[in-house]
Amino acid sequence: MAEITEVRIYKSKGNGSVKAYASVSFDNEFVVKGLKVVEGEKGLWVSMPSRRMKDGSFQDVFHPVSREARDKIVDAVLKAYQEQE
């Protein structure tokens, strides 16, 4: 997997379940924007960038294929978020 070289956190304003947005840079060559840090019933989790389809459903714009890659991204985003608390 590409190395995560930077994570930027943008705190959300308001009291909704979305606590922050994040962008993740890989290998200092490309960036994925629009990840969300969401507070749910079981704690914080990270939502991958998605868009709403005409039928109202959501489709991921970016998502890791392997569990290992997903865990690496989620861990990096949550760590960066918690460091800003």
Swiss-Prot record:
<keyword id="KW-0132">Cell division</keyword>
<dbReference type="InterPro" id="IPR036751">
    <property type="entry name" value="SpoVG_sf"/>
</dbReference>
<dbReference type="GO" id="GO:0030435">
    <property type="term" value="P:sporulation resulting in formation of a cellular spore"/>
</dbReference>
<dbReference type="GO" id="GO:0051301">
    <property type="term" value="P:cell division"/>
</dbReference>
<keyword id="KW-0717">Septation</keyword>
<dbReference type="Pfam" id="PF04026">
    <property type="entry name" value="SpoVG"/>
</dbReference>
<protein>
    <recommendedName>
        <fullName>Putative septation protein SpoVG</fullName>
    </recommendedName>
</protein>
<dbReference type="InterPro" id="IPR007170">
    <property type="entry name" value="SpoVG"/>
</dbReference>
<comment type="similarity">
    <text>Belongs to the SpoVG family.</text>
</comment>
<comment type="function">
    <text>Could be involved in septation.</text>
</comment>
<keyword id="KW-0131">Cell cycle</keyword>
